[in-house]
Amino acid sequence: MIRGRKRDGTVHARPDVCLSSMDDFFLRKPPAMDESPRLRPLSRAEARNLDLRAVRELGLPTLVLMENAGRSAARWFLEDWLSQGKGNLTDHKVLILCGPGSNGGDGGVMARWLDLAGVLVRVAWVSGPVPRLPAGDAAIQRDALAKAGFDQQDWVLPEDNAKLAKSLSWCTWVVDALLGTGLTRPIDGAFRTAVEMINDSGKPVYALDLPSGLDADTGEPLGVALRATATATFVAPKLACQYKEAEEYLGEVAVLPIGLPYALLEDYIEED
């Protein structure tokens, strides 16, 4: 019997979910990379183009891709990180920092899966210095979490830096779903301060797609970048992953599938 958490943080038995293994929880394990085509590192533009092709050529809604990404990220996080060492999943408190774009939406999906596994989750939708709520698919994720009663907050930096500091003291892990691969300009101002606060906290960071602030093409920090313990990058490695200088920001990297078929991937298969 799975043990989960109520919204007040107390642990309770969940008789409606009886699981013999994590495989049962996720129904079917996503294919390991050694069982799937090995793809060469992709540029920021190539990764974006793959998503667009999935929508235009296959008719896949972007919300489906987001759901698949968040689910894959939650699985690796639960199996290879939260389940390691002593203690139970319910001993962890995970702070998921979401930006207003699709990377934040991936974090919103991940929050639901972690909650289902019994992990205590706090979600913060972060913007600043001008307030900006999530749009599109990310807004759908935010609304779903709100209706499900999640511990969910809207932060505008730098005004809410104190909330960030308090949550960093509270959590055992930080999930970085702030900026993803689309960033092209240096991080400055309020977001730079936030990145520095997270790095200085010493809390392990699990980054979605790429650590916030790391240039997807060059592997260099755009002013400043989060130093992740682990990075879950989707579909294929990004160009940044091939540079030794980026290792201190990436941590351990896993390439996770989001359900794109071979027909879309064959042009990017790495040659022997």
From Swiss-Prot:
Task: Please state which protein family the record places this protein in.
Answer: Belongs to the NnrE/AIBP family.
Q: What class of enzyme is it?
A: isomerase
Metal-binding in keyword set? yes
Main function: Catalyzes the epimerization of the S- and R-forms of NAD(P)HX, a damaged form of NAD(P)H that is a result of enzymatic or heat-dependent hydration. This is a prerequisite for the S-specific NAD(P)H-hydrate dehydratase to allow the repair of both epimers of NAD(P)HX.
Q: What is this protein called?
A: NAD(P)H-hydrate epimerase
Q: Which cofactors does this gene product need?
A: K(+)
> Which EC number(s) does the record attach to this protein?
5.1.99.6
InterPro entries, per this entry?
YjeF_N_dom, YjeF_N_dom_sf
Which of this chain's residues are annotated to bind (6S)-NADPHX? S102, N103, G104, G105, D106, G180, T181, G182, L183, T184, R185, P186, D209
The record, for PROSITE patterns, names: YJEF_N
One Pfam family it belongs to: YjeF_N
Look up and give the organism this protein is from: Isosphaera pallida (strain ATCC 43644 / DSM 9630 / IS1B)
Q: Where is the YjeF N-terminal domain?
A: 47-266
Key words of the record = Isomerase, Metal-binding, NAD, NADP, Nucleotide-binding, Potassium
